[in-house]
Amino acid sequence: MPPKKAPAGPSKKTEQKKKEKVIEDKTFGLKNKKGNKQQKFIQQVQKQVQAGGHHPRQDGDKKKDEKEKKLADLREMASIFKPVQTQKVDKGTDPKSVVCAFFKQGLCTKGDKCKFSHDLSLENKVEKRSMYVDMRDNEDDLMTNWDDAKLKEVVDKKHSEEKRRPTTEIICKFFLEAVEKSKYGWFWECPNGEKCIYRHALPPGYVLKRDKKKEDKPTEISLVDLIEKERAALGSNQTRVTLETFLAWKKRKLQEKKAKMVAEEERKKSDFSKGKQFGISGREMFSFNPDLVDDGPIEEGDAAFDVYKREDDDDDNAFEFKELDLAALSLAAKEVDGSGTIASSTRLLDQATEAAKTAAAEDGAASDDENPSSSAPANDAAPFNKDLFVDLAGELDDLDLDDEDD
C-alpha cells in the first residue's frame, strides 16, 4: 500500500495575500504620511512580514558567530605552538640581567648585538644572595675531589697569593654600605674588585643599623589597652565611687584649690614687697599697692576714678555644703493644712482700690503745688508795641538783594 501523500499546503498566492493583509493592518493610516519616522516604520514592517516573521539581522549574527569561531581557532593554535612574545623590561632594570626569550627558544638571530643576556645561568640566580656567605669561599671544594691538574693549579695559586697582602676577618666597608642601603645583590661588585682582601659576609649574630632602629622604636599601645592596664594596676582595695564619696572628694578639691590660691597670692605679695615683679600682673600690682594709681593730676583725656582700700572678706567666699538625705526629706513632708497661708478671694479687688486711692491723693497734691492761688492768675507778659513794624516794608524795598547775589 503506497504511503499517504502529505496534505497540500496553502499556495504562494494565498500566503502573499495574507502578508499584504498583515502589512495593511499594521500600517493602517500611515501610507499617506510623509514623515521620515513613519516611512521607516512602514519599511520595517514590510521587511519583517516578507521575511516570515524573522528579524533581518539574523544573518549578521551568523557572520559574527563565524568570526568568533575563527578567532577561537587562532587562539587555540597560538596556545599549542606558543610563539615568542616581545620582551618588556621595567624602567631602571639592566636588560643584560634578563635572559633573551628568543635565545631560549633557539630563534635569536642578533647574536652579540642582542641587548638581552644569552647566559642561561642567570635563571639560577633568581634566589636572593645571602649576606652571611662570601661567594669566594669554596667549602665543597675539598682536597679529596682534586685531580693532578687541580692540585697543580691550587699550588700555583697559593704561591702567587703569598706575594699579596694577607687576608683578614675585617668586613669590607663597601660591602657594609651596600647592605645597609639595600644595594647588595647578585650583580653588586666591590669597588676593590675580585682582589679585595676584606670579607664580604656578615659574621653570625650581626645586627644591621636599620634593624636596630626598628628594635629601639617603642611599641605603641592603644588608648583602650592603656586604660585597661592602668585599671589592672590599681588593685582591688580601692574606694568605690558613690554620691557621698564624690561630694567629699569635690569638697576636698575645692578647699585645696582655695588654699593654693591663697598661698600663691601671699607669695606674690611677699615678692612684690621685696621688689620682685616677675610673674606679677598689672592688676595684682595695683591691688597690692593702691597708691600706684594716684600718680599725678588728671590730664585731658584721662578717666576719673576713686581710690579705696579693698577689704578681704573671707566669709563671702566661704563655701557651704549640705548633704541631702532623701529619707529625711520624705519624713519631713506633710500635707497643707490651709491655716494662714490661703489668699483671700477679694485680694485683687482690694489691691486695685488701694492703688486708685493712692493715685488720687498724689494727683491732688500735685495740683495744689502747681496752682497755689487760683484767684490771682499770673500776668508776666510784656506790653506789645504796635508801631514796631510800620516802616519795615519800605526798608525791605530799598535793599538791593540781586546785586549782592551777583
UniProtKB/Swiss-Prot annotation:
<feature type="coiled-coil region">
    <location>
        <begin position="57"/>
        <end position="82"/>
    </location>
</feature>
<keyword id="KW-0175">Coiled coil</keyword>
<dbReference type="InterPro" id="IPR000571">
    <property type="entry name" value="Znf_CCCH"/>
</dbReference>
<keyword id="KW-0863">Zinc-finger</keyword>
<feature type="compositionally biased region" description="Basic and acidic residues">
    <location>
        <begin position="12"/>
        <end position="28"/>
    </location>
</feature>
<feature type="zinc finger region" description="C3H1-type 1">
    <location>
        <begin position="94"/>
        <end position="121"/>
    </location>
</feature>
<keyword id="KW-0479">Metal-binding</keyword>
<dbReference type="GO" id="GO:0008270">
    <property type="term" value="F:zinc ion binding"/>
</dbReference>
<feature type="region of interest" description="Disordered">
    <location>
        <begin position="336"/>
        <end position="382"/>
    </location>
</feature>
<feature type="compositionally biased region" description="Low complexity">
    <location>
        <begin position="352"/>
        <end position="364"/>
    </location>
</feature>
<feature type="compositionally biased region" description="Low complexity">
    <location>
        <begin position="372"/>
        <end position="382"/>
    </location>
</feature>
<feature type="region of interest" description="Disordered">
    <location>
        <begin position="1"/>
        <end position="70"/>
    </location>
</feature>
<feature type="zinc finger region" description="C3H1-type 2">
    <location>
        <begin position="166"/>
        <end position="203"/>
    </location>
</feature>
<dbReference type="GO" id="GO:0003729">
    <property type="term" value="F:mRNA binding"/>
</dbReference>
<keyword id="KW-0862">Zinc</keyword>
<keyword id="KW-0677">Repeat</keyword>
<dbReference type="Pfam" id="PF16543">
    <property type="entry name" value="DFRP_C"/>
</dbReference>
<dbReference type="Pfam" id="PF00642">
    <property type="entry name" value="zf-CCCH"/>
</dbReference>
<feature type="compositionally biased region" description="Low complexity">
    <location>
        <begin position="1"/>
        <end position="11"/>
    </location>
</feature>
<dbReference type="GO" id="GO:0005829">
    <property type="term" value="C:cytosol"/>
</dbReference>
<dbReference type="GO" id="GO:0002181">
    <property type="term" value="P:cytoplasmic translation"/>
</dbReference>
<feature type="compositionally biased region" description="Basic and acidic residues">
    <location>
        <begin position="56"/>
        <end position="70"/>
    </location>
</feature>
<dbReference type="InterPro" id="IPR032378">
    <property type="entry name" value="ZC3H15/TMA46_C"/>
</dbReference>
<protein>
    <recommendedName>
        <fullName>Zinc finger CCCH domain-containing protein 15 homolog</fullName>
    </recommendedName>
</protein>
<feature type="compositionally biased region" description="Low complexity">
    <location>
        <begin position="38"/>
        <end position="50"/>
    </location>
</feature>
<dbReference type="InterPro" id="IPR036855">
    <property type="entry name" value="Znf_CCCH_sf"/>
</dbReference>
<comment type="similarity">
    <text>Belongs to the ZC3H15/TMA46 family.</text>
</comment>
